[in-house]
Each structure stands twice: as structure tokens, then as C-alpha cells.
Amino acid sequence: MNPLIPAASVIAAGLAVGLASIGPGVGQGTAAGQAVEGIARQPEAEGKIRGTLLLSLAFMEALTIYGLVVALALLFANPFV
């Protein structure tokens, strides 16, 4: 077995987790900031805004979890070996 394949898999796993968390991290920060701004403008809509925010944060976090699954597959169930 070529020793370059496991080394490349470790690097690819790190990149998968790192790059998969950049987009959702920025999106979650923006969404939370806009939710706070919306609640400050209309305090009576707090419940509706908060519920929508939590649902959208869950969908954004799913993208990071997909990256983690890909990284774990590269590390422990390496398809290239």
C-alpha cells in the first residue's frame, strides 16, 4: 500500500471539516445578528423570529455535520485503500 494515501486522507479529512464549517459559521452569525435586529425592531414578534431562527440554525448546522461524516469516512472507512 502506498503510504501517501493515508496521509492524503488525513489532510483531506481536516480540509473537509474545516471548509464545511466556514459557510455555516458565517451563515449562523449573520442569521443570529439579523434575528437580534428583528427582535429589537419588533419585540412582539420575538417568538416567531426565535422559532424561525432555531429551525434555520439546525439546517445550517447539518452542513457541518455532513462534512464531519465525510471526514470520518475518509479516516476510518477509507475508500481509497
From Swiss-Prot:
A Pfam short name: ATP-synt_C
GO molecular function: lipid binding; proton-transporting ATP synthase activity, rotational mechanism
Keywords: ATP synthesis, CF(0), Chloroplast, Hydrogen ion transport, Ion transport, Lipid-binding, Membrane, Plastid, Thylakoid, Transmembrane, Transmembrane helix, Transport
Additional free-text comment from the UniProt record: In plastids the F-type ATPase is also known as CF(1)CF(0).
GO cellular component: chloroplast thylakoid membrane; proton-transporting ATP synthase complex; proton-transporting two-sector ATPase complex, proton-transporting domain
Subunit record text: F-type ATPases have 2 components, F(1) - the catalytic core - and F(0) - the membrane proton channel. F(1) has five subunits: alpha(3), beta(3), gamma(1), delta(1), epsilon(1). F(0) has four main subunits: a(1), b(1), b'(1) and c(10-14). The alpha and beta chains form an alternating ring which encloses part of the gamma chain. F(1) is attached to F(0) by a central stalk formed by the gamma and epsilon chains, while a peripheral stalk is formed by the delta, b and b' chains.
Protein name, per record: ATP synthase subunit c, chloroplastic
Cell compartment(s), UniProt: Plastid, Chloroplast thylakoid membrane
Keyword Amino-acid biosynthesis: no
Domain of life (superkingdom): Eukaryota
Natural source organism: Cycas taitungensis
Regions crossing the membrane: 3-23, 57-77
